[in-house]
């Protein structure tokens, strides 16, 4: 499956001025899946830690530590090597640790070569996270075009885009197919 936000993640990875990433968005929009898929395709190693379920990580990170010690701890927790530029560290549910902003900022200042992405359930509070210290992306629910991609309706996607761009009408059969897919899309939204 492809999400439009993936292009922004690739840009983030390649950006030499990259800051720790916060992927924010509503529940059940695919934030964890997106970062795991991105990590598995773009990096040698993807380290994932869920701060909502990993009590030892949450307890450890809730107390101030030296950034290098934190990186070693997270590497041990994830059970995979954390290497500059070839590993992606994903911290899920960072809203569970109120002072995580300070910790991530310290790591980024001391070790900018590490790629750190985090997942925030909801919308980041600007009082807790400085927009100058983080790259923040928002993942929205699947849109209709992404739904068509997920269902391998590439030709239909292209036709809709072409007719929209040209301000031209679709043929009846094509329009019926587009409406049928749109109804399925609306039903999928109900089940989120």
Where are these regions (language model features)?
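Phosphate-binding site recognition
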Residues: 1-190
